Amino acid sequence: MDKLIKTISASGAFRAYVLDCTETVRYAQERHHTLSSSTVALGRTLIANQILAANQKGDSKVTVKVIGDSSFGHIISVADTKGHVKGYIQNPGVDIKKTATGEVLVGPFMGQGHFVTITDYGTGNPYTSTTPLITGEIGEDLAYYLTESEQTPSAVGLNVLLDQEDKVKVAGGFMLQVLPGASDEEISHYEKRIQEMPAISTLLASENHIDALLAAIYGEEPYKRLAEEQLSFQCDCSKERFASALMNLPTADLQAMRDEDQGAEIVCQFCGIKYQFTEADLEVLINDKA
């Protein structure tokens, strides 16, 4: 089971989240049939979204939109405070050649664009924030958003590693944030530690990457584990929800689906599940609209 661990330094000057999202990203790859580069781009977005949702309280939901002018198209993800996330990439078929070390590049091919977050607190007034894509690597873009939009200096590292068959091998990352009251000396100390950290891909390749991430962040410094939360890819779509959407169509359109198409098929963008509406199903909807 995927998980997110929340920690805080003994001094209370910093907090860090570390995540294992391997099964989440693996399931997303299976559902959307993504090729290598699309898998990594979507996976990083899902991880970033889970970090943002973990920062919220109550029954909030956070939507992340990575909108660039690249061949990836838009990447959309939605996560809640219960550890659930869903998402899709507009073009699942991007397969850019790897580097000599086997890395899948994303940033250089993301293009110009924006990192958009929409936080829904359930009050009917969602809060939207938009920051520019800085590198297109998603992790750096999330760090920039947290620092500039939420005014919380942050460091973020996240990645998805693939095996020789381009299947998800491991996925995860970390977020480190400065908390109010941190001294300049403490900030400088952790800035130096982050600069000296091994590459996120190296840490994820460790036998136990959760422990490797925590060791890289804290070293010998004492810290406290605050919480451990389970994470998963979970879509809340249903035939009933799509039936409600069909009810918003003009009756003539529903009649055409019934008489000309002998039914309708709706595919959920977020998880790829297909829902079939037979002629009888459409007849019920038409009668309900009457």
Curated annotation (Swiss-Prot):
Cellular compartments annotated: Cytoplasm
Classification via InterPro entries: Heat_shock_Hsp33, Heat_shock_Hsp33_C, Heat_shock_Hsp33_N
Domain of life: Bacteria
Keywords: Chaperone, Cytoplasm, Disulfide bond, Redox-active center, Stress response, Zinc
Keyword Nucleotide-binding: no
Residue pairs linked by disulfide bridges in the UniProt entry: C235-C237, C268-C271
GO molecular function terms listed in the Swiss-Prot or TrEMBL record: protein folding chaperone; unfolded protein binding
Post-translational modification, as annotated: Under oxidizing conditions two disulfide bonds are formed involving the reactive cysteines. Under reducing conditions zinc is bound to the reactive cysteines and the protein is inactive.
Gene Ontology BP term (one): protein refolding
Single GO cellular component term: cytoplasm
Keyword Translocase listed: no
Family from the record: Belongs to the HSP33 family.
Classification via HAMAP family: HslO
Its biological purpose: Redox regulated molecular chaperone. Protects both thermally unfolding and oxidatively damaged proteins from irreversible aggregation. Plays an important role in the bacterial defense system toward oxidative stress.
Protein's name in the database: 33 kDa chaperonin
Origin species: Streptococcus equi subsp. zooepidemicus (strain H70)
